[in-house]
Amino acid sequence: MALTQRLEFRQSQSLVMTPQLMQAIKLLQLSNLDLTTFVEEELERNPLLERANDEASGGEAPAEAGQFSDSDGGHNDEPGGGPGEAFEPGQEEWMSKDLGTRAEIEQTLDTGLDNVFSEEPAEAAARNAQDAAPTTYTEWGGGASGDEDYNLEAFVAAEVTLGDHLAEQLSVAFTAPAQRMIGQYLIDLVDEAGYLPPDLGQAAERLGASQQEVEDVLAVLQKFDPPGVCARNLSECLAIQLRELDRYDPAMQALVEHLDLLAKRDIAGLRKVCGVDDEDIADMIGEIRRLNPKPGMKFGAARLQTMVPDVYVRPGPDGGWHVELNSDTLPRVLVNQTYYSELSKKIGKDGDKSYFTDALQNATWLVRALDQRARTILKVATEIVRQQDGFFTHGVAHLRPLNLKAVADAIQMHESTVSRVTANKYMATNRGTFELKYFFTASIASADGGEAHSAEAVRHHIKQLIDSEAPAAILSDDTIVERLRASGIDIARRTVAKYREAMRIPSSVQRRRDKQSALGNVLSTAMSDRSRNPEPA
């Protein structure tokens, strides 16, 4: 078989994921807070991007910076002051003869003249005093723009974190560097509730210390303030606090070691393992409840971000619903075409031209991508409102089954696009603020063959049935199934149990025990009050 060389031409098509397309997909699924951060980074990175509300839009700022150019020769009537300012007699000639043009000087010094030649001391002091005086509430509060509210948080002292509080005690408790290192490592592992991981063997291995050395340091850390900190589980946390109160006797130790019985309200089992009577076990349970299961939560932690809705839904004048985007969450950026035009005339190097050409393309793409993102969110939100009109009008019981494909087909988009749009987006309605994904629920068949029911609506129905049950007639899962089927909802018992557990509703046995216990407490309190205040004969 002979080997030959030949040329072949083939035509083929393939999908290419360009960097800009990847960025566009990323923008769709960003939350409004993450989007703001992304746009801020682009504004710092791209010189041709600017905020739409900037005063120097359209290239005014670059034009002002270019007032002192070679063609001007330093003879501009407004060299750096306000309009109408002029040089003192002889000052203009001195500037041109002795120092040359401003542009030449700045190019030589690689910085601006304002950074080199300071003002006269008296003028500088007056200017600083004037600049330092805040003129608006925003300046007092440290706000970034004039339309922001007064920022009282600027005057609030920073909260002390749990790690800082423990580190202060660590420096006093240990003098040996090795123990301090172990202690600091363990403090770094403490979560915001004040707990350490259950297994510290890996910590000893990483530190090159023995398990006993780590345990010795941990024993000291567990005596730090707040009581209960640096525990590895709830039982250990409660035991530390009880030792601090000198209440960790054998009976209390048995109770702490059997918290599972306390969670089940198995009072008889607790009496047996603790070896005490009803009165003592009640007092012991009361002491346990007064302890703090999360001692670290009273210290400062990362500030939670406020949930800001992306879409508002309001009743329309014609009886429908008005859907609009939250304009406050949409970053407004523009491409400074004027600046690019001026730079194009002055740039001589090919590398610089390529840089600014790429910057222009990226800026143009970002503006279009932000606009397309806003339009897509509005389109998806509008379709969700149309599909779930019953929910907005009557409540969660009328929430319809809905999936991503139904919305995607209605607005002629891909299902993956709808999935990205609904991620991390929130809708403010007359019934509260919901994540867009909340409106997508599975369907449960109707018992009479009619319209299917939403899983969220069924969960709501189950919760209503349990909330309205009488203490003497607790509903079992089988009874709930019968009542749901009577309402036209075809559902299995295991589904009811799954929904009930997802809503953290205990079983019928536990609910009966809880309600009987609560009823017994009410009756005993009433009898006690009656014995203290007998009715007059």
From Swiss-Prot:
Record has Transcription regulation as a keyword: yes
Record's signal peptide: none
GO biological process: DNA-templated transcription initiation; nitrogen fixation; regulation of DNA-templated transcription
PROSITE patterns, per the entry: SIGMA54_1, SIGMA54_2, SIGMA54_3
Stretch list, region Disordered: 52-90, 507-537
Assigned protein family: Belongs to the sigma-54 factor family.
Protein name per its UniProtKB record: RNA polymerase sigma-54 factor 2
Organism field: Bradyrhizobium diazoefficiens (strain JCM 10833 / BCRC 13528 / IAM 13628 / NBRC 14792 / USDA 110)
